[in-house]
A protein has these predicted regions:
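Domain-level signature for proteins that mediate thiol-based redox and metal-cofactor handling
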Residues: 2-100
Length: 100
């Protein structure tokens, strides 16, 4: 199956928007769990977004990029949804650190 570059870019953009929307809905899924299981989290997505913007000459701050991914200011999201990491989560994160 051959997909032209324009269509591929549109499909990738739609997939990214769907992923971001899914993560906004799944506030029960903590970033540390994402990091431990998949090696990335919402903060990683926002950093990659900011880096991609910079490659195109678009200046975005970390807070601006995080708001794009979180759908609200990061501090607000943390207050509403972030839970204290358990000792087990912290240990798993430390053990997987070289993979991040």
């Amino acid at each position: 199956m051959a997909i032209d570059d324009k269509t591929r870019t549109e499909l990738e953009a739609a997939t990214f928007r769907t992923l971001v929307a899914h993560l906004r809905e799944r506030t029960d899924v903590q970033n540390i769990d994402l990091m431990n299981l998949a090696g990335f989290c919402r903060n990683c997505l926002s950093r990659w977004y900011r880096e991609a913007a910079a490659e195109k000459g678009v200046s975005l701050s970390d807070p601006e990029a995080r708001e794009i991914v979180y759908g609200m200011p990061y501090d607000e999201w943390r207050k509403k949804h972030q839970k204290e990491a358990t000792p087990e989560q912290k240990a798993a994160f430390a053990a997987s650190q070289p993979k991040h």
